[in-house]
A protein has these predicted regions:
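Short beta-strand to alpha-helix junction loop
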Residues: 62-65, 90-99, 138-157, 275-280, ...
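N-terminal Rossmann-like FAD-binding beta1-loop-alpha1 element of flavoenzymes
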Residues: 2-29
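Flavin-dependent oxidoreductases
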Residues: 15, 175-180, 184-264, 268-278, ...
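C-terminal catalytic lobe of FAD-dependent flavoproteins
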Residues: 248, 257-258, 273-396, 403-414, ...
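Glycine-rich FAD pyrophosphate-binding loop
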Residues: 22-42
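Iron-sulfur (Fe-S) cluster-binding segments and ferredoxin-like electron-carrier domains
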Residues: 404-415, 438-456
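Dinucleotide-binding Rossmann-like beta1-alpha1 core, especially the glycine-rich loop
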Residues: 46-126, 250-251
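Helical element adjacent to the flavin cofactor pocket in flavoenzyme catalytic cores
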Residues: 138-195
Length: 479
């Protein structure tokens, strides 16, 4: 019997697992996909928000502010790409200037530091590629950009090194309570746990209703994006927002930590698993973004993608212990600023577990930092040392991103192994560049198959079932 079962291995579930790993607790993450961070966590704007947007007094406001600080600390400690570049909310009319004042006041109430309203002159000096129709902007220098999947992986891997188990390809189909123990039915048998943390993202309402009365409903909301080549990465220096509206923070234009430019999202109701992109959605994103930054060359787009947000009617996080089922804790409605808030929510979940009866006895010895060898960021001297120690680091596999065979082998053998081409991409960036794996994809697939001692046909692109190869032609071809 586990002490705690965490359902869902997105950023929220991984953050809770990371915190639980510091204590003598038997914990497990249960995830239906074949890797962590493959839902909303891998498909969002990758922004650590400032905290001026949420309504004062909400859980969003509280945790966004705390998370803005704590997430940065964790990224430094766990070697996760993060840059504090600040954000600008741009106004294009006198009416929108009033919105900037309202946002600034809201930010002051929430505790956001160092905000300023810039006039047109200062704005265009700092951001020369902005539209000259911009009249003013709210500056929030505490805003950061991050690699969301690398953060979730860092938290989950550290948790694993500290004794937390991860069960992938394990889908929850039912939950029953017997005495003080929850019996979680899955496609891989029954998992027993004294406490449940429901961090199931867009499916959190369904998981909640397996055991509890319906207390909230998630309305999945899809957002579509462009990812631009690095040739566009220096167009803006800050995260550029337009004034928010009832649909959310609107279409942003921002650098990424890897040097690209991200543009999006729109906002439309969708099915929970609908990550398709549409001409209508992408046209809207493109036309709206060009109002802010008219010089974006959309011919330099290297990928389109969509992510689904877990929206709730009251636009706030639902973080509470069920009143009828002791030890069942919901962490739901984790829409924006969910990524910014998750790391700060996790320590409070541990307090809730403790108040519900879980004994938290700190471990004497834990892993709480990590280092990743990123070949392209090393000096020539350090590269030479690494190649001498391990010749696989002297062989470039992904030319676009300068990723070596050594990095790919390391990705396959990390605490949560990479078993698909995209799982390697999330761990070391192979396949993230201009050709999107067109050149290195087959070579990465061969390395994974070799390292895991599996047939090449068993290595998928991403999720289970996304197989690329059906068999060897000389062996009779397709199975």
């Amino acid at each position: 019997v586990y002490d705690v079962a965490i359902i869902g291995a997105g950023i929220t579930g991984c953050a809770i697992a990371y915190e639980l790993g510091k204590y003598n607790v038997k914990a497990v993450i249960v995830e239906k996909e074949n890797d962590v961070s493959v839902g909303t966590t891998k498909a969002n704007s990758a922004i650590i928000h400032g905290g001026y947007d949420p309504k004062p007094g909400t859980k969003m406001a509280e945790y966004n502010i705390k998370g803005n600080v704590y997430t940065k600390e964790l990224c430094e400690k766990l070697d996760v790409p993060y840059k504090q570049i600040g954000a600008l909310v741009v106004a294009f009319s006198e009416e929108e200037k009033k919105t900037l004042e309202e946002l600034k006041q809201r930010g002051i109430t929430n505790g956001v530091p160092d905000m300023e309203i810039w006039d047109k002159e200062k704005l265009l000096k700092e951001e020369p590629n902005l539209s000259d129709k911009a009249v003013a902007a709210l500056s929030s220098p505490n805003v950061g950009i991050v690699s969301p999947w690398e953060l979730a992986l860092a938290l989950a891997e550290t948790a694993v090194l500290n004794g937390v188990e991860v069960k992938l390809n394990t889908e929850v189909s039912g939950i029953e309570k017997e005495n003080d123990t929850y019996k979680i039915e899955t496609n891989n048998g029954v998992i027993e746990a004294k406490y449940i943390c429901n961090a199931a993202g867009v499916f959190a309402d369904k998981v909640n209703e397996m055991c509890n009365e319906k207390t909230f409903e998630i309305t999945p909301n899809k957002g579509e994006y462009y990812l631009m080549d690095k040739s566009q990465g220096n167009l803006v220096n800050h995260v550029i927002f337009q004034c928010p509206n009832e649909k959310g923070k609107g279409v942003l234009v921002a650098p990424t930590v890897h040097g690209n430019l991200i543009v999006g999202p729109d906002s439309q109701p969708s099915a929970a698993n609908d990550v398709s992109t549409t001409k209508q959605g992408l046209d809207f994103v493109r036309n709206t973004a060009l109002k802010s930054v008219p010089g974006i060359n959309f011919r330099e787009s290297i990928r389109n993608f969509a992510g689904v947000r877990a929206r709730t009617a009251d636009h706030d996080f639902h973080i509470y212990e069920d009143k009828n089922n002791k030890g069942f804790i919901n962490i739901a409605g984790m829409q924006s600023p969910g990524l910014s808030s998750a790391c700060a929510i996790a320590p409070d979940i541990l307090k809730m577990l403790e108040n519900s009866g879980l004994t938290l006895e700190a471990k004497e010895d834990i892993v709480d930092e990590r280092h990743i060898d990123r070949f392209k960021h090393l000096s020539h001297e350090d590269r030479a040392k690494l190649v001498e120690k391990n010749p696989a680091f002297g062989k470039i596999i992904c030319r676009c991103e300068t990723i070596t065979e050594g990095e790919i082998i390391n990705a396959v053998h990390r605490p949560i192994p990479a078993t698909s081409i995209d799982a390697v991409k999330r761990r070391c960036n192979a396949g993230m560049g201009r050709c999107q794996g067109g050149f290195c994809g087959p070579r990465v697939q061969e390395i994974i198959a070799r390292e895991l001692n599996k047939p090449l046909a068993d290595i998928p692109q991403d999720r289970l079932g996304t197989n690329i190869i059906t068999g060897e032609t000389k062996d009779g071809g397709a199975k």
